[in-house]
C-alpha cells in the first residue's frame, strides 16, 4: 500500500538538498510538529466552540454569539483571552505540585495524538507504522491526570468527580480499543495512512462503516464517553458535583481542561473520519471524476486540487460528527453513573468482543471484502 509522503522525511530531505547538514536539518524540524499541532488544534477548537455556541443557541431558539466579530466568530477568542488573564488560584489545602500536574497530564496526550492523524492525502505529520497503538497508549494517560486533579484539590466534589472521570475513562477505553482492533484486523496495519488507503478505490462503498457498522457505533459511543460529552458528562455534572474535578480550578489551569475537552472532541471526530468514513477519500472515486471531466489522473493540477479537496473532505466529515455530538447534548438526557458503567462493562464490552470475533470469521470467509 502507498504509505503516503511523510512530512518529516520530505522536509529534512528538502533542507539537505539545499546544502544544510543532516543534523541541522533534523534540529530545524524538531519544533515544527509541535507548532503545527498547536496551531491546527487551536484553530479546530475555536471553530468547535463557535459551532457549539451557535448550535446550542439554535436549539434553544436564541441567536447566540453575534457582536464579537462577524457572526460572533471571535467569541471563542474572547473566551480564551478572558481565561488567560484570570487569576490562577491554588487552594490553601491543595497539593500544589499535583494540582498543577493534573491539567498538564490531561491536555498533553491529546495534543500528541494529533501526530498520527492524516489530515489529507499524503499529509501526515509523522507516519509511523504503529499510529493506532500510540493513540491508544496516549489516551490511557488521561485518567491519571483526571484522578490527580480531583485528589489534589482537597475537595469532596473534586475527588468524586476525579474518581468518576477515571472510572468512566477506563470503562470505555476497552470497547474503544476492541472496535479499533477490528479495523486493524481488516486493514492488516496499525498505520492510519494504510487504513485510509485500504478504504480507497471504491468511493463511498469502500468505507469501513459498511463493513463495521457495529464497530462504528461502539467507537462513537465510547469516544463521546471519553470526551465527557452529554449524555456522559457525569464527572462534571453541575447539578450533582458543582463542576467535578474542575471545581477548584481557575485561570489558565481551568483553560487547559476546557481546551482538552474540545481538542479531544475534534480528535475523536477526525479518527472516526479516518477509520470509518474513508478519511480524505471522496464519495465518488477520483479516477471516475477525472474521466467525467476528461482530465488525466497524472495531470499535476488535478493532483494539487485532489490533495486540497482531500483535506477539505476530511474536515467536513469530522465537523459533521462534531455537529452530531453537539446536537446530542440538547436531545439526550444525562444517564446515571450506574447506568453509564453498566453500558460500558455489560453491553459495549461484550458486543465489542462479538464484533471482533465476527470480523475474524468474515475475514476468513470473505478475504477480498474483509482484507484477508
Swiss-Prot record:
A biological process (GO) of this protein is: aerobic respiration
**Entry's Pfam families?**
NADHdh
Top-level EC class, please?
A: translocase
Q: In the record, what terms sit under GO molecular function?
A: NADH dehydrogenase activity; oxidoreductase activity, acting on NAD(P)H, quinone or similar compound as acceptor; quinone binding
GO CC field: plasma membrane-derived thylakoid membrane
Q: Which UniProt keywords apply?
A: Membrane, NAD, NADP, Plastoquinone, Quinone, Thylakoid, Translocase, Transmembrane, Transmembrane helix
Principal cellular location given in the protein's record: membrane
Location(s), subcellular: Cellular thylakoid membrane
The protein's Enzyme Commission number: 7.1.1.-
Checking InterPro entries in the record gives:
NADH_UbQ_OxRdtase_su1/FPO, NADH_UbQ_OxRdtase_su1_CS
Lipid bilayer topology: Multi-pass membrane protein
What is catalyzed by this enzyme?
a plastoquinone + NADH + (n+1) H(+)(in) = a plastoquinol + NAD(+) + n H(+)(out); a plastoquinone + NADPH + (n+1) H(+)(in) = a plastoquinol + NADP(+) + n H(+)(out)
Task: Note whether Ribosomal protein occurs among the keywords.
Answer: no
Query: Which chain regions cross the lipid bilayer?
Result: 27-47, 65-85, 97-117, 128-148, 166-186, 204-224, 266-286, 308-328, 347-367
Query: Coiled coil where?
Result: none
How would you summarize the oligomeric state and partners of this protein? NDH-1 is composed of at least 11 different subunits.
PANTHER family this protein is in? NADH DEHYDROGENASE SUBUNIT 1, NADH-UBIQUINONE OXIDOREDUCTASE CHAIN 1
What family is it from?
Answer: Belongs to the complex I subunit 1 family.
**What is the annotated role of this protein in its UniProt record?**
NDH-1 shuttles electrons from an unknown electron donor, via FMN and iron-sulfur (Fe-S) centers, to quinones in the respiratory and/or the photosynthetic chain. The immediate electron acceptor for the enzyme in this species is believed to be plastoquinone. Couples the redox reaction to proton translocation, and thus conserves the redox energy in a proton gradient.
Provide the protein name: NAD(P)H-quinone oxidoreductase subunit 1
Organism of derivation = Trichormus variabilis (strain ATCC 29413 / PCC 7937) (Anabaena variabilis)
Q: What is the lineage of its organism?
A: Bacteria, Bacillati, Cyanobacteriota, Cyanophyceae, Nostocales
